């Protein structure tokens, strides 16, 4: 640890070769001092420089890569660990475009054992979409990490703030700021927040089930925001409404007939419906309960599953339903068993019954559709589930989950990194999905769960 006689706080940048340590050093120092290239191990010596972070002078150390198979690796590793021991704070940099290997984790834990005043810095997260990759590094066991992109100057400001807080240097010195420091503060200004997304909702169903009536009922009071856009009567029609601060765009798709009856222009309509669903987040499946369900209803419902959409079942014409409530619900549960997670709303579009409930349910389902499970909590639930019902063996060989990571949302997508991913049986996957639904309430939301070995995860 840093000794009391030192006047400057010291920050060491550690990590394996070619993860961006020297680039981060140059970014913080605002000068190209260390050699940077795509060739692993270009930094052999420890580069030192006094720099100013938001007006505070600190000493920054850039170390050689700690790769196991590098030349002079033992000497470099020993030098790095000594630098770690003498520093006040360590920035351990990893490559966010790669899945961590066992060697990554082993080296990090060795550094952390030497000096627990350590930040895990995940570099090369160049845009918001790539943030999903960072969750693979939950296996390092750090409660907080920092996603940055040195080349795009993303996340640097937040990292600097955290560094100053950790070093108890969190009060910016206002006097005697020179031009370079002012420039640094400007360059590291926080990034603008992304604009809130419009919820895209596709209305699907057979012909004459009441899709257009539902659209009219949903947009009756708010349709002045966006006027109807239609090329022909078989084109999807867009309408946007505002619920509180949330915009919702509805797409009324063309009604779908039996395939044998789809000819000419209706084939075009089906293609347009497919394209409309490709950009949708949620599907409203409209079912006509004035008569029994038909096979085509089930086939149309598979469109939502095909496009991995959130889904809400709308039972229209409820005022003239063909059977009592209990009978219809029992039939619905039997015929649409694969949509048991979908909420069901009864309505009469012509009488505007339960229309507000549909609007608010869309927002609720979208929140579930966009949900991200905290990585530590996700792994805790998966661990408990596998302990409660252990994974079946694979020909007498142990099957285990190393860790789980949610790598995407809309819909939630989770990878299980396993020693034998092909041994994950469909029934056990369903058990894990049901467990996650029970714990985290993924209402109306498909959950995608896949199994990978470490090598496959690394390649992705």
From Swiss-Prot:
PROSITE patterns: G_ENGA. One of its GO terms (molecular function) is GTP binding. GTP 1 binds at residues 15-22, 62-66, 123-126. Signal peptide: none annotated. It holds the Pfam family KH_dom-like. InterPro entries: G_ENGA, GTP-bd, GTPase_Der, KH_dom-like, KH_dom-like_a/b, P-loop_NTPase, Small_GTP-bd. Residues 9-171, 199-370 form the EngA-type G domain. HAMAP family: GTPase_Der. Associates with the 50S ribosomal subunit. This is GTPase Der. Belongs to the TRAFAC class TrmE-Era-EngA-EngB-Septin-like GTPase superfamily. EngA (Der) GTPase family. Residues 371-455 form the KH-like domain. The keyword Metal-binding does not apply. GTP 2 binds at residues 205-212, 252-256, 316-319. Keywords: GTP-binding, Nucleotide-binding, Repeat, Ribosome biogenesis. GTPase that plays an essential role in the late steps of ribosome biogenesis.
